[in-house]
Amino acid sequence: MIGIDITSTDRIKKMYEKFGDKFYEKFLNPDEIELIKKPETAAGFWAAKEAASKAIGTGIGGSCSFHDIKIKKDALGAPKIKYKKEIRKKFGIKKSHLTITHDAGFAIAVVVNVLKKK
């Protein structure tokens, strides 16, 4: 399954300016917040989590929340994504891949989930 999302960096920046850390806490865990050094990164993480929820066919909501999805960076700074165990099991996810790009004030993320054979 594939999910994609595009997010305005300016929108994320304005939300942070208005609500501060409370805004980040709505969609990021403490480890993810530590990785945020600029609005572009936060926008990329937002887009990544939205794309991940779309890749399981639900969107963000009752079946999958922002906090059911975790983003890390590898040694080279590339983003990595992981769903909570309950989500992986419920949707039969074997492995997940994430890419994030930024251009013209937008963050775009694509998530590809490899599913377990039935």
Swiss-Prot record:
What residues bind Mg(2+), as annotated? Answer: 5, 50
Q: Does the keyword Magnesium apply?
A: yes
Q: Which InterPro entries match?
A: 4-PPantetheinyl_Trfase_dom, 4-PPantetheinyl_Trfase_dom_sf, ACPS, Ppantetheine-prot_Trfase_dom
SUPFAM superfamilies xref list: 4'-phosphopantetheinyl transferase
Q: Which family does it belong to?
A: Belongs to the P-Pant transferase superfamily. AcpS family.
Q: Name one GO molecular function term.
A: magnesium ion binding
The organism encoding this protein is: Aliarcobacter butzleri (strain RM4018)
User: What's the protein here called?
Assistant: Holo-[acyl-carrier-protein] synthase
The task this protein performs is described as: Transfers the 4'-phosphopantetheine moiety from coenzyme A to a Ser of acyl-carrier-protein.
Q: Name one GO biological process term.
A: fatty acid biosynthetic process
Keyword annotations from UniProtKB, A to Z? Cytoplasm, Fatty acid biosynthesis, Fatty acid metabolism, Lipid biosynthesis, Lipid metabolism, Magnesium, Metal-binding, Transferase
